[in-house]
């Protein structure tokens, strides 16, 4: 009887992690798969301590064993991370970002007519001159896939894109 409960407990998290695929669209899952494959240096289908060390080394970063262990320990059971667990961990991290309302409110501070849109050039100026300043190249990159029509940056749609991904594959 106790072993049956143990088996059931192990199955529940598996079902929960498989639902992670519903959190992302196909394009996002493909991007995560590419990232996973880049980290999985030995191509065994799992990310382990050695894969993480190799990845950081390839980026020119020196990290401690404790840092690597803390990353692996984020996975339940502190075992090598398969793709489903990788997606689950990213899903948890992404849901840990600011809620849509908080992001939208940050933009809304500059939206004098409460239209949900900001003038593209005005936003560019704000991003390059205030707070943590962005370079022109960074702003260009940000604006590349941003919802801008008629010189108006739609921050409501942009916030949705940040939290839920783009729909450009569906619209094409």
UniProtKB/Swiss-Prot annotation:
The effect annotated for residue 18 to A is:
Partial defect in embryo elongation
Q: Which UniProt keywords apply?
A: Calcium, Cytoplasm, Cytoskeleton, Metal-binding, Motor protein, Myosin, Phosphoprotein, Repeat
| Tissues expressing the protein | Expressed in the spermathecal and uterine walls. Weak expression in gonadal sheath and intestinal muscle. Not detected in vulval, pharyngeal or body wall muscles.
Every EF-hand domain range: 27-62, 98-133, 134-168
**Disulfide bond positions:** none
Q: Which GO terms describe its biological process?
A: embryonic body morphogenesis; establishment of cell polarity; locomotion; meiosis I cytokinesis; mitotic cytokinesis; nematode larval development; post-embryonic development; protein localization
Q: What is this protein called?
A: Myosin regulatory light chain
Q: PTM comment for this protein?
A: May be phosphorylated by let-502 or/and pak-1 and dephosphorylated by mel-11 to regulate its activation and myosin II-mediated contraction.
GO cellular component terms, A-Z: cytoplasm; filamentous actin; myosin II complex
Can you say where in the cell this protein is located? Cytoplasm; Cytoplasm, Cytoskeleton
Q: Which domain of life is it from?
A: Eukaryota
One Pfam family name is EF-hand_7
Question: Deletion: any effect?
Answer: Arrest at the 2-fold embryonic stage which is associated with a defect in embryo elongation and failure of seam cells to elongate to a narrow morphology. No abnormalities in body wall or pharyngeal muscles and in the number of hypodermal cells.
Residues modified as Phosphothreonine are 17
In its UniProt record, a GO molecular function of this protein is: calcium ion binding
Leader peptide range in chain numbering: none
Which gene carries the instructions for this protein? mlc-4
Task: Give the main location.
Answer: cytoplasm
Ranges in a coiled coil: none
InterPro entries from the UniProt entry: EF-hand-dom_pair, EF_Hand_1_Ca_BS, EF_hand_dom, Myosin_RLC
Which PANTHER family does UniProt cross-reference here? MYOSIN REGULATORY LIGHT CHAIN 2
Miscellaneous comment in the UniProt entry for this protein:
This chain binds calcium.
Function description:
Regulates myosin II activity and organization during embryo elongation. May be involved in the organization of mlc-5 into bundles. Required maternally for cytokinesis during meiosis and mitosis in the early embryo and for the establishment of embryonic anterior-posterior polarity.
Query: Where along this sequence does the record place binding of Ca(2+)?
Result: 40, 42, 44, 51
């Amino acid at each position: 009887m106790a072993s049956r409960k143990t088996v059931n407990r192990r199955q529940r998290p598996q079902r929960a992690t498989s639902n992670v695929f519903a959190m992302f669209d196909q394009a996002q899952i493909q991007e995560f798969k590419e990232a996973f494959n880049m980290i999985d240096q030995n191509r065994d289908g799992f990310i382990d301590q050695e894969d993480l060390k190799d990845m950081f080394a390839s980026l020119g970063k020196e990290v401690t064993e404790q840092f690597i262990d803390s990353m692996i320990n984020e996975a339940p059971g502190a075992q090598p991370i398969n793709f489903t667990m990788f997606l689950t961990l990213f899903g948890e991290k992404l849901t840990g970002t600011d809620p849509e309302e908080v992001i939208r409110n940050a933009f809304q501070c500059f939206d004098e007519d409460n239209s949900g849109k900001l003038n593209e050039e005005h936003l560019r100026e704000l991003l390059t001159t205030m707070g943590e300043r962005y370079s022109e190249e960074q702003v260009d990159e940000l604006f590349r896939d941003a919802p801008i029509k008629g010189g108006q940056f739609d921050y409501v749609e942009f916030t949705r894109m940040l939290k839920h991904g783009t729909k450009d594959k569906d619209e094409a």
